[in-house]
Amino acid sequence: MLGVQLDGNLEHSGGPIMSDQIDQMLGLKTWAIVGLSNNSERAAFGVAKLLIEKGHQVIPVHPKAETVHGQKGYEKLSDVPFPIDVVDIFVNSDLAGEVVDSAIAINAKGVWLQLDVIDQSAVERAENAGLIAVMNRCPAIEYRKRP
């Protein structure tokens, strides 16, 4: 069952997220970060910077369509004119399902719901559509765990 509670952390269907799944996601190049703006106080800003430092192409997706870290922003996922590998979701859990549905519609390879962004049914939809799904984790934290 999706969202099994283990040691206080919401986990991936079937138990803890396997390290190879996270490695697979971290190995994908183009990340759209939904909720990324120029607000340097927000976690998305720092995560985007780290992803760029790790060699990823980062695409800001935000209603303001701001350029962030020198990367052109877009208002919504469907506005991005090239393929996106991972949709990293930095929005309220109530909005996450809509973003996951957009990720499915644009044929993303994976969705990453950030810490405290919880939507079990959206993750199920993503997995049923063939996407890799990670929920309640942070790629910056996962990178720091790796050599």
Regions found by a protein language model. Give the residues of each.
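Short, Lys/Arg-enriched N-terminal segments with co-localized hydrophobic residues
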Residues: V4-I17
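Conserved beta-strand elements of the Class I
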Residues: A32-V34
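NAD(P)-binding Rossmann-fold cofactor-contacting core
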Residues: S37-R42, K49-H69
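A short helix->loop->beta-strand "cap" motif at the edges of active sites that frequently abuts
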Residues: H56, I106-G110, A129-L131
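Helix-adjacent hinge/juxtasegments
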Residues: Q57-K64, H69-V86, D94
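Short, charged, surface-exposed secondary-structure boundary motifs
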Residues: V68-Q71, D85, S121-E124, E142-P147
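Mid-chain, well-packed structural core segment of small domains
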Residues: L77-V117
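Rossmann-fold NAD(P)-binding glycine/threonine-rich loop
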Residues: L115-Y143
